[in-house]
C-alpha cells in the first residue's frame, strides 16, 4: 500500500474502528478533513523504516504510537491526530514523527496495547481532572465502549466504587472489569 501517502514507518496492526461519516466532518482544529483520508487513531506495530535523524537501530522495534500530533514549539495550537489530520491505523503502514513512537515490551497483544493511548489516555485525563480518589462513587455512562471500559478499570484502581451504565448483555463484562454495580442503559 505505498501509493499516495509517503514513507512507511510502523506496521499498523490494530485500531478501534473509529471512522468519520462524511467529508464535512471537522478535525480538532475545526477544519474540514482532507480526503482521501485513512482513519484510525489507535496504532501498535513494528517500525519498518525511519526518517532522517532517527537511528536505523529502531527498525524492528515493537512500538505504540501516541496519536496526538503536537507542534514542535509545544503549544496546543493546531494539535492534530493520527487518523484525522494524518493517515492512521487502518493503513498497512503509518508515518508518524519519531517523538510519537514509543518502544514497548509487553505480553499484551497489539490490539490490546493499541487501545491505551486514546481510550485509556482519555479516561486517565478525565479521572485526573475530576480528582477521583478512594471511596468516591463514579457513575460511568457508556461503560460498554473503549473509553468507558477504561474509566471503569482506572477508577477502580483508584479505589472508587464504580457503577457502570451498560446493556444487560455486557453487564457481566463490566463487573469483571471492576464495576461494583451495573445499570441497564435503557432503564
Please place each PLM-identified region on the residue numbering:
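NAD(P)H dinucleotide-binding glycine-rich loop of Rossmann-like/cofactor-binding domains
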Residues: 26-34, 66-142
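Hydrophobic packing within well-folded, soluble alpha/beta domains
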Residues: 47, 57, 63, 101-104, ...
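Glycine-rich beta-strand-centered segment in the early N-terminal region that forms part
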Residues: 4-69
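Short glycine-/acidic-enriched loop or helix-start segments at secondary-structure transitions
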Residues: 59, 74-75, 150
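Mid-domain Rossmann-like dinucleotide-binding core that forms the NAD(H)/NADP(H) cofactor-binding site
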Residues: 108-186
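Cytochrome P450 core scaffold surrounding the K-helix E-X-X-R motif
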Residues: 1-3, 74
Amino acid at each position: 500500500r505505498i501509493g499516495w501517502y509517503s514513507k512507511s514507518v510502523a506496521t499498523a496492526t490494530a485500531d478501534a474502528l473509529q471512522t468519520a461519516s462524511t467529508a464535512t466532518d471537522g478535525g480538532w482544529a475545526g477544519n474540514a478533513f482532507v480526503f482521501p483520508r485513512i482513519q484510525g487513531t489507535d496504532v501498535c506495530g513494528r517500525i519498518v523504516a525511519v526518517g532522517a535523524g532517527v537511528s536505523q537501530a529502531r527498525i524492528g522495534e515493537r512500538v505504540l504510537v501516541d496519536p496526538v500530533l503536537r507542534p514542535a514549539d509545544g503549544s496546543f495550537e493546531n494539535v492534530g491526530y493520527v487518523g484525522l489530520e494524518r493517515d492512521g491505523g487502518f493503513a498497512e503502514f503509518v508515518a508518524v514523527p519519531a517523538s510519537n513512537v514509543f518502544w514497548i515490551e509487553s505480553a499484551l497483544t497489539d490490539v490490546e496495547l493499541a487501545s491505551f493511548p486514546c481510550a485509556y489516555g482519555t479516561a486517565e485525563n478525565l479521572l485526573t481532572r475530576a480528582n477521583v480518589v478512594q471511596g468516591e462513587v463514579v457513575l460511568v455512562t457508556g461503560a460498554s465502549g473503549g473509553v468507558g471500559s477504561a474509566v471503569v478499570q482506572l477508577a477502580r484502581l483508584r479505589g472508587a466504587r464504580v457503577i457502570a451504565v451498560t446493556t444487560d448483555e455486557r453487564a457481566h463484562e463490566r463487573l469483571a472489569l471492576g464495576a461494583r454495580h451495573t445499570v441497564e442503559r435503557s432503564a
